[in-house]
């Protein structure tokens, strides 16, 4: 896999607050190789941005290569600070996404998920054609509630026809269930890992602040740019 230049610089990461970790009492000792220093006054760890830049560059190379071969991506970030950035990133890169709640078994029980997606598509079609409104009022109200729930939880994967090739996780702790499902199925993962995370669980960890919106946005923007470049390469050379 060839290495490319992704315009990743330390100053930009510092402005985005990528270098702010969790309180020192919350740290995971496995993160020691990724930590630059401890700020005593604030009691927090500072991730080593040189290593962050290196791993982010490797992640960009990986997703570019995968996208250039037509692979499918799933971006997962369900906490409020990540949800908006996840949607924008996924739409821009034409990726699947989950930004509300991870339903247990979404990947490991793919048959059930696929059945739910069929139900979701059928209800949407019923609504678009107006057939839904011809039903009794009680049934209409119940089906509309079901449609709203399916839209919230499955709207980002409504066009997913099979398991993703790579999953990008914004917060390892928050998305632990999704991460375990990926590990079970052998799906490669790219994880933003803060100083309280376990880097061994991710196939490609990116040490970074996973709580600040600017930090999340910067990391996702770099990955999305690489995916878009890879997709363009795939279109030119199918």
UniProtKB/Swiss-Prot annotation:
Q: What is one Gene Ontology biological process annotated in the Swiss-Prot or TrEMBL record? A: translation
The question of whether Plastid is a record keyword is answered with: yes
Q: Name one GO cellular component term.
A: chloroplast
InterPro entries on file = Ribosomal_uS2, Ribosomal_uS2_bac/mit/plastid, Ribosomal_uS2_CS, Ribosomal_uS2_flav_dom_sf
Gene3D superfamilies linked: Glucose-6-phosphate isomerase like protein, domain 1, Helix hairpin bin
GO function terms (MF aspect): structural constituent of ribosome
Q: Which residues form a coiled coil?
A: none
Alphabetic keyword roster:
Chloroplast, Plastid, Ribonucleoprotein, Ribosomal protein
Tell me the first and last residues of the signal peptide.
none
Q: What is its main location?
A: plastid
Record carries keyword Transport: no
Q: Where in the cell is it found?
A: Plastid, Chloroplast
* Cross-referenced NCBIfam families: rpsB_bact
Q: Which family does it belong to?
A: Belongs to the universal ribosomal protein uS2 family.
**Protein name per UniProt:** Small ribosomal subunit protein uS2c
